UniProtKB/Swiss-Prot annotation:
Compositionally biased spans, kind Low complexity: 334-352, 427-439, 521-535
Annotated organism of origin: Danio rerio
Record-annotated PDZ domain positions: 95-172
Protein name: Delphilin
Gene3D superfamilies assigned: 1.20.1160.20, 2.30.42.10, Formin, FH2 domain
Record's compositionally biased regions (Polar residues): 322-332, 557-602
Compositionally biased region (Basic and acidic residues): 44-53
Primary role: Postsynaptic scaffolding protein.
Xref: InterPro entries: FH2_Formin, FH2_Formin_sf, Formin_Homology, PDZ, PDZ_sf
Entry keyword Ubl conjugation: no
Pfam families, sorted: FH2, PDZ
PANTHER family with a match to the protein in the record: DELPHILIN-RELATED, FORMIN HOMOLOGY 2 FAMILY MEMBER
Primary localisation category: membrane
Gene assigned in the entry: grid2ip
Compositionally biased spans, kind Pro residues: 441-455, 462-477, 484-493, 607-628
Length: 1009
């Protein structure tokens, strides 16, 4: 479509309509030819929208060999090059031109490949041209948009111009496969998955050299998996590449690879992991397979890895939960526990009638699920959909039921059905994790097993005779339910006095179901499992008004438990619970006393003492739950919180939690200061050290001592012999800079204690002060090492001043230019060239010639001056060659070189005085060395004085020559004016010559001759 830019604007509308109609016709022909072969393999150029549509790398060919003629084969290739075969044209297509001008379109888009219009704003150009909600955008200005991603379509629409042409199709919105249920579209053709096309790069990420059983990664995916399974695998890998979370990858991929043949895909996935991630992945999957083998279900995985063995923690758990059925009702054992012991053979139904224990699948959409998603979307601020890569915080897997008739760990059908009255998903539930229907599978507990609490129960005011004889049996239809599973038991009960993070309450029907099942597999009829009743609150706002749902309002904040032998721990929901007010808790507790008394009376005659640890005596429920010992610890400061999604319990977590206690995380992330003073060990306490130098000076002196790498005695010898071989000028400057001042010298002289009590820099300075005339020796050493360099710099500076003064005074071409400037200025100022002439001007006006612009504003006075000199006085244009030293003299700082010369003379005088003051000895050679040095450098200093005198005399003369006061004007200011004038004149001259003489002159036309 690059030819569109060559079409005149008045004909572009017809061009767009013709192109759109042509594309639609070709699309229809492609459909009619492609119907006998509805499964066409897309070319790589169509799978990746980043490549141009005209790519010749591959073309679409029939997936299966057929009897079509070669002509139809070629037609298929041609049509599929421009129109992808995944799309089916319909009669609802229409071409619309949007006259938007500089406005926005006025609609919002959703989805990709193709995108569709989610909403149309009233009064917008989109509404004016007839676009409606649900229209799919197929073509934009003749360009195919059906395989493009959402971001690319948006960018193409933004650059589509003022009157873009759209080909849209009406009809219901087709959500991508990721937003729909895989069970609803099992027969979708492979060529109709644009979402899978966008993930094709994942299947091609491994090189073709990596093969298993003779096939590459993409070939094995296509050979072994269905369309939905391939999408799930690719989407899981794409998410893993972003977050590198192996646990999430296993949760997403493991349920798909559920056969020995499919599990070959793991060998390709391992190639994308690091060595540590491979070991972690193998360990996790071994736990899955180990649990399934315990349930008499062979995994058939052909890969090699080591299975995890039960440890001491598992033995403790087996002693605590003695029920053989508890493993079957706990979906977390496969993640957090080693393989359980096999079940007795009489407990299991025949193998062909049994379903697999644990699978990973998503629940079907229901009315309660939609309510839950709406509530969650309001909290999060954006729409939350059920997609395949949806990662629930805890419940990424669920449990399938056995075929047994009257299992005690089964729930009745009405408890798990989506249409249940007593246990429907409420609107205030905000848990991200959910299971089939409206039931929630709780995660493993987060705390070790505490001693059991007293037997207590809190229910609604109406008492119920809950006995196994009076309660009905569960309907047998539940055992054949393919999705709904009984809620699992946590391996360990919660603390009695600790506020739970996941508190739920069972309904009355749940309590009936718990006692209605006869015990079939219990070896000890007297033992009873634990039933936990929690408060089903999700929002932090506590509502005191009664709930309108048939579910009874349980508001007790205390964990109540009942002991039963062969039943699992039933929990209906899992939500976060705030603390209730004391008055409300007390009121609800009073209402629940009748049922509590009746229920306890029923159980008191049947419940024997549980195994150790023994139960504490029963007591009344407190008004508020007691805080945990960790929360009541006064030394535990408030720390920052980390926001994450909770996963299932890990058997190694408690070992890590014990180790974390010794990491001192409160010191790093604490938000409160501990009022108690911190006690430092003895070796870190500051000793009694005497400090005389200031803190900053002592710190810098310590750094200097480390750099010198000289002992105090060695430095003292250097100062006595005045040797310059081991000291750099920079070190001598720092020694002078950090030397003690007069006040500190007095403190050192009065110090009569042990020198070892002084700090290290103070000890160093104390030894240096024992050298007579310490600072004078340092200054003399510095002068001895730097005087030659200083004299050379000053000599060069004075020579520049001297030469520049002579050049300005003797330049004839500069004088001629200044006369021309004066004449032009007189003409402009007076109007007539011969009346009231000005005889001179200040030289600083030379820097302002470019500020006076011409009438048209295109040139300046300096440009006119350069142009006039080019035409009338071309010999004056090279005046800058007469002033070569002037730019160098402009950089000389007169004050600096004058101060340096004065410092040289003062230092020489101080050294001579010190030579007279310090007597010459065999050890102290200061006087002999420095006297000889002064005699040697005297001629150079005397020559420098003479040059300085001559340079300044010449400068005074040239300043007076140009009408400046030499006593006020400095050298850098004076020479800087001429240096700036030379630079600006050269620039204006080059601009003028460039305008008059262009680089590529054109030959005059013969017609102009």
């Amino acid at each position: 479509m690059f030819a569109r830019i060559f079409i005149p604007k008045k004909h572009r509308q017809r061009f767009d309509e013709a192109v759109s109609q042509s594309l639609i016709n070709r699309m229809c022909r492609s459909k009619s030819l492609g119907e006998p072969q509805n499964r066409l393999r897309r070319s790589r150029s169509q799978d990746h929208h980043e490549r141009p549509q005209g790519s010749k790398r591959a073309s679409s060919v029939p997936r299966d060999t057929g009897d079509e003629p070669a002509q139809n084969d070629r037609t298929l290739r041609k049509s599929n090059t421009m129109i992808p075969t995944q799309y089916v044209s319909g009669v609802n297509q229409r071409t619309i031109r949007v006259y938007r001008g500089k406005k926005s379109f006025g609609f919002t888009l959703r989805g990709h490949a193709p995108v569709w219009i989610d909403s149309v704003m009233p009064g917008s150009p989109a509404e004016a041209c007839g676009l409606k909600t649900g229209d799919r955008i197929l073509f934009l200005n003749g360009l195919d948009m059906r395989n493009c991603s959402h971001e690319k379509v948006v960018s193409m629409l933004q650059g589509s111009g003022a009157m873009p042409s759209l080909v849209v199709e009406e009809g219901p919105v087709d959500y991508p496969q990721s937003d729909s249920e895989p069970e609803e579209t099992p027969s979708a053709p492979r060529s109709r998955s644009p979402a899978l096309s966008s993930l094709q790069w994942v299947a091609e990420i491994l090189p073709p050299s990596i093969r298993v059983h003779g096939r590459t990664f993409s070939q094995q995916l296509e050979h072994l998996l269905t369309l939905q399974e391939r999408y799930t695998i690719c989407k899981a890998l794409e998410t893993f590449f972003q977050h590198r979370n192996v646990d999430t990858l296993i949760v997403d991929v493991f349920p798909v690879l559920d056969t020995p043949a499919k599990q070959l895909i793991w060998q390709f996935i391992y190639q994308l992991l690091t060595y540590e991630e491979q070991e972690h992945c193998k360990t996790k999957i071994a736990r899955f397979l180990g649990f399934k083998s315990a349930g008499n279900r062979k995994s058939g995985l052909s890969l090699t890895w080591t299975d995890s063995f039960p440890g001491p923690q598992f033995e403790t758990y087996q002693q605590t939960v003695a029920s053989p059925d508890s493993v079957d009702s706990n979906p977390y054992v496969s993640l957090d526990s080693p393989p359980a012991s096999p079940l007795p053979s009489d407990e299991l139904s025949p193998l062909p009638q049994r379903r697999k224990l644990f699978t990973f699948s998503r629940p079907p959409r229901s009315r309660d699920t939609d309510k839950f998603l709406d509530a969650l979307s309001e909290q999060l601020g954006h729409r939350v959909n059920i997609v395949d890569d949806f990662k629930g915080g805890e419940n990424d897997y669920e449990e399938m039921s056995f075929q047994d008739e009257q299992e005690v760990n089964m729930l009745p059908h009405e408890l798990s059905s989506a249409s249940s009255e007593d246990h429907s998903s409420s609107d205030d539930s905000t848990s991200v994790s959910y299971s089939s229907g409206s039931d929630h599978i709780p995660p493993p507990p987060q705390s070790p097993p505490p001693p059991p609490p007293p037997l207590q129960f809190t229910d609604s005011p109406s008492p119920l005779p809950i006995t196994p004889e009076h309660l009905p049996q569960p309907p047998p239809a539940f055992q054949h339910h393919p999705i709904i599973a009984p809620p699992p038991p946590p391996p360990r009960p919660f603390l009695a006095n600790r506020p739970s993070l996941h508190k739920v309450l069972p309904t009355r029907e749940e309590l009936r179901a718990q006692h209605s099942h006869p015990r079939r597999s219990s070896p000890q009829p007297s033992s009873q499992p634990i039933l936990q009743l929690h408060q089903p609150k999700a929002h932090p706002i506590l509502q005191s008004s009664p709930h309108t749902s048939p579910q009874p309002p349980h508001t007790s904040a205390q964990h109540t438990r009942l002991q039963h032998p062969s039943q699992s721990i039933y929990q209906s929901q899992q939500t976060t619970v705030p603390r209730t007010s004391p008055s409300l808790t007390k009121q609800k507790s009073l209402h629940s006393q009748p049922s509590q008394q009746s229920f306890e009376g029923t159980l008191s005659s049947k419940v024997p003492p549980p195994p150790p640890p023994p139960l504490p005596p029963p007591c009344d429920p407190p008004p508020l739950p007691k805080p945990s010992p960790k929360a009541s610890d006064n030394n535990h400061m408030s720390v920052k919180r980390l926001r994450w999604e909770q996963l299932g319990d890990d058997p190694d977590y408690h070992k890590l939690s014990d180790m974390v206690k010794y990491l001192d995380l409160d010191l790093y992330f604490g938000t409160q200061r501990n009022s108690k003073p911190t006690f430092l060990p003895e070796n870190l306490k500051k000793k009694d050290v005497v400090e005389i130098l200031s803190h900053k000076k002592a710190y810098n002196a310590s750094i200097l001592i480390a750099h010198l790498k000289l002992a105090p005695k060695e430095l003292r010898d250097i100062l006595m012999t005045m040797s310059t071989e081991r000291l750099e000028p920079a070190h001598i400057k720092q020694l002078l800079l950090y030397a003690p001042d007069d006040e500190e010298v007095k403190q050192f002289q009065h110090y009569d204690q042990d020198p070892a009590k002084l700090s290290e820099p103070d000890q160093f300075v104390l030894q240096m002060l024992l050298v007579p005339e310490y600072k004078t020796r340092l200054r003399s050493l510095l002068f001895k090492t730097t005087v030659q360099e200083k004299t050379e710099e000053m000599r060069a500076a004075y020579e520049c001043i001297y030469k520049a003064s002579l050049e300005l005074k003797n330049s004839k071409r500069l004088a001629k230019i200044l006369e021309f400037v004066l004449a032009m200025g007189n003409y402009l100022n007076n109007g007539q060239p011969k009346t009231n002439k000005t005889t001179g001007f200040k030289i600083n006006f030379l820097t302002e010639l470019n500020t006076t612009k011409t009438v048209d504003g295109k040139s300046t006075f300096l440009h006119i001056l350069a142009k006039s000199l080019c035409q009338h006085f071309p010999e004056l244009l090279g005046f800058s060659r007469d002033l070569i030293t002037v730019p160098l003299a402009a950089k000389v700082n007169q004050r600096t070189i004058t101060a340096d010369l004065s410092d040289v003379h003062s230092t020489i005088q101080d050294i001579r005085t010190a030579c007279v003051k310090i007597p010459a000895t065999a050890e102290d050679r200061f006087a002999a060395v420095m006297s000889s040095f002064l005699e040697n450098c005297h001629p150079a200093v005397q020559s420098l004085d003479s040059l300085q005198q001559r340079a300044m005399d010449e400068f005074h003369k040239v300043a007076s020559y140009f009408g400046e006061d030499s006593k006020v004007t400095t050298t850098e200011t004076f020479f800087g004016i001429f240096a700036e004038f030379i630079s600006k004149f050269e620039r204006a001259l080059s601009e003028t010559q460039g305008t008059e003489n262009p680089k590529s002159p054109r030959i005059a036309s013969p017609l102009a001759w």
